[in-house]
Amino acid sequence: MLKKSLLGTRNWRRLCLTAVLSVSMLGIVPQAFAEGPNDPAPSITPTTANGKKVLFDNTHGQTAGAADWVIDGGFSDFANALGNAGYLVKELRKSTAITLSDLSAYDVFVIGEANIPYKTSEQSAMLQYVRGGGSIFFIGDHYNADRNKNRWDASEVFNGFRRGAWTNPAAGMSTAEAASAAMQGVASSDWLSANFGVKFRYNALGDITANNIVSPSQAFNITSGVSTVAMHAGSTLAVTDPNKAKGIVYLPATTTKWASAVDQGVYNGGGVAEGPYVAVSKVSAGKAGFIGDSSPVEDATPKYKREETGGTKTTYAGFQEQNDASLLVNMVNWLATKESYTSLTQVPGLTLDSATTIYSWEQPANTTELQAEPWAAPAAGYNWWDPSTFKVGSYGYSTATNTTDPFAFVHQAQLPNQAVFQVKIILNGLTANSTTTGYNIGIYNGSGIQVAKVQNSNGTWPSTYGYSTSFSLTADASGHAEKIVSIQINPSISGSANMRLRQNTTAKFTEAVTIANVPVEPLP
C-alpha cells in the first residue's frame, strides 16, 4: 500500500486525460446500482481483441478497508491497460464459493489482496484450473495488512495458513465469526508452497525501489523494459521448489522495514537472500505469477467507501510509478500464453534458482502470533463477515432501493433456517400504475428440492415446502413495485440454494443464496 502521493499536479492531469481516453477507446460497460455480489459485474471490452480473457476476483474482501481492488476502481489503470492490450476484462462477483466453472472460460485469474480465506473447495478449484492450463496472478502485501480486521491478511490467505494459528484457522475469533459462512470449509495447509513451489514470507519491508531485475532472457521476457519496480510496504516470497518457481525481481540490499512491522520486518538484509519480490511458477499446463505488494498495481481512483466506517478511501497512482505498468502487463501476457512444458527444468537455457533459505520459525507449525490480532478493534457494529453491517457506499451495502434492474430480492446475507424471516421482492419496468398477477416465490436446493414455506396472505402457513400461493404486484407511477413476504426454511437444511420468482410456471428471476443457522435480521 502506498503511503504518499506519487504524482505532481501536471502528471496527475496527464494521467486523468489518459484514463478518459482509455475509457472512450475501450467501452466499459456502465453499471447502475452495481454495489454488491448480486448485481451485474463490470467488464471492459477491447476495441481490438486478442481473443483472451482476464477475470479479477472480488469475492474475498478485495474492497475491505482502504483497498479498492476492482477494475472500475482502484485497479482501473491496470484493467484499462489490459483492455488496451486486447484483453476482455471482467470482475468476478458472487456471494457463494468459487468453483471451476467460474474460472474455466478465462485465461488469467487476478487476485488482488484477498482478505477472506479461501475454502478448501476453492483452493481445489483454483488448482484444477491451473493444472488444466489456466493462470493465476497473486497480488499480496506486507504481513498484517489485515484490512477487514478478521486476523487474516493476503499473504496468509494465499499461503493457506495464518501465522500462529496452524492448528485452528479461526483461533481468537468470536463464536459468530467462527460460525460464519466465510469460515466454513477453511483449513490450514501449506497450499501455495506445496502446489506452486513458492510462498509469501511474513516480512514487512518499507518504501524501496526494487532494482535487482533478472534479465528478460532468464525471466520469460516479463522484465523486458523493466529497470525498477516500486514497493511501498510489502513482502517478498520464498522459492521452495526451484523446479516450479523462479524469482524475476529482487530488492536491493536494505534494512528499511515498514514502520508498523510486528517483528524485524526485514529478514535477510534484502537482496536475493530476502527472496524475490516478483516470482513466477509453472504448474502442469498452467502458470502463476506473484508480487509482494499491491502498491505497483493500484491507482488513485477508488470507487467505494470504507465498509467499516463509510469513510472515503485514499489510494495512490502506483501503476504509473517506476516501470510498474510494463512489468504488470508483461506478466499477464506471459500468464495468458499457453505453453506445453510442465517444469522449469524443461526450459532450454534457463538457470534455475536455489531454494530461498528460511528460518525454522517460518515453518507453518512453528509460526507464532507476535502481537494480538486484529491489529485494531473493529468499529462498533461492523462485522467483516456480514455485509448487512457495512456502511452506505461500500461494496456489499444494499439498503438502497433498486430502481434499475427488472427483478431483485432484498434479504439478509445468509438466510436463517431456525426462524421466520422476510424477503422483499422488487420489480421495475412495469406499466405505470398497473397490476400484474400470478407471481410465486420458492427456495430450492441443488437437487431441486423445495426447502421453504412462504406465509399465505391470510397469515396461515402451507403444510408442505414449495412455491408460495400466487400473489399480485401493483406498480407505482414509475413502474416500480415491491412486496414483502415471510419465509420459513426447513431447519435441517443449510448451505447453498436458489431463490426463484416465477410468474405462473415461468421463471422470472433466480438468485443464489446461502442458508445457515444465523439470527434473523430486519430488512433494511
Region roles according to the model:
Residues 2, 10-34:
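Sec-dependent N-terminal signal peptides of Gram-positive bacterial secreted proteins and lipoproteins
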Residues 190-299, 373, 421, 426-428, ...:
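Catalytic beta-strand/loop cores that center a nucleophilic Ser/Cys/Thr
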Residues 54-56, 90-91, 107-112, 135-140, ...:
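Structural recognition of the beta-strand scaffold that forms the well-ordered cores
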Residues 33-105, 142, 315-319, 337-406, ...:
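Aromatic-Pro/Gly-enriched surface loop or interdomain linker
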Residues 117-221:
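A glycine-rich, often tryptophan-bearing local segment used as a flexible ligand/cofactor-contacting loop or short
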Residues 410-524:
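Beta-strand-enriched, solvent-exposed domains that form extended recognition/catalytic surfaces
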Residues 60-63, 95-98, 110-118, 136, ...:
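Solvent-exposed loop/turn segments at secondary-structure junctions
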Residues 61-69, 110-116, 173-182, 314-321:
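Second-shell loop/turn segments in exported
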